[in-house]
């Protein structure tokens, strides 16, 4: 069983898990997590599967994402946690509330509702899929190649936070966009 990657901030006894949105990662919440840590929370910035530094898998559903969080909590011996789930993380949180309500002290679901949404990220995924890292050597080049697919610069910069150096001179994405 693989355990989700996390960055843990703070040393308090109240456990707060942050679940990021689609195409994001836990570190998107780093600034706010420091504030929450300063008021008594130990904050777990989790990268959900196929995102950030967590493992990649062809299995991907909200039930599976919720089971990943249960496994994470078991591994870290966490119980009665607070959870903030944003967008995709909110859907994960709703599933977690059904699968393991005893695990939750309280939760917040942000920026999403319990309904089925029309897929609307295909243009972003197409843009990310066409990035040829044999031709791209820096973030600016990646942004330029992504711009026909993602017009908004802020959105491009958000997506390109997923760039990382696989090895010196070789970039890659911390996203499993195939799934």
Model-flagged regions — what are they?
Residues 13, 21-24, 87:
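Active-site glycine-rich loops that stabilize anionic/oxyanionic intermediates
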Residues 33-38, 42-84, 88:
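Active-site loop/oxyanion-hole signature of alpha/beta-hydrolase fold enzymes
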Residues 23, 48-52, 114:
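Alpha/beta-hydrolase active-site loop signature
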Residues 94-99, 103-137:
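Flexible "cap/lid" loop of the alpha/beta hydrolase fold
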Residues 18-21, 45:
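Structural cue for short, hydrophobic secondary-structure segments
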């Amino acid at each position: 069983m693989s355990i989700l990657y996390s960055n843990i901030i703070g040393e308090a006894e109240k456990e707060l898990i942050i679940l990021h949105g689609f195409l994001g990662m836990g570190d998107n919440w780093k600034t706010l997590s420091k504030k929450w840590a300063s008021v008594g929370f130990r904050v777990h910035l989790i990268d959900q599967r196929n995102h950030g530094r967590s493992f990649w898998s062809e299995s991907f559903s909200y039930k599976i994402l919720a089971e990943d969080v249960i496994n994470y909590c078991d591994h870290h011996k966490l119980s009665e946690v607070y959870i903030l789930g944003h967008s995709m993380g909110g859907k994960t949180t709703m599933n977690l509330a059904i699968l393991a309500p005893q695990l939750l002290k309280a939760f917040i679901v942000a920026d999403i509702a319990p309904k089925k949404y029309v897929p609307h990220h295909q243009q972003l995924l197409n843009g990310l899929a066409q990035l040829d890292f044999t031709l791209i050597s820096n973030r600016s080049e990646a942004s330029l190649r992504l711009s026909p697919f993602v017009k908004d610069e802020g959105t491009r910069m958000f997506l390109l936070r997923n760039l990382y150096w696989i090895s010196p001179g070789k970039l890659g994405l911390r996203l499993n966009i195939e799934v």
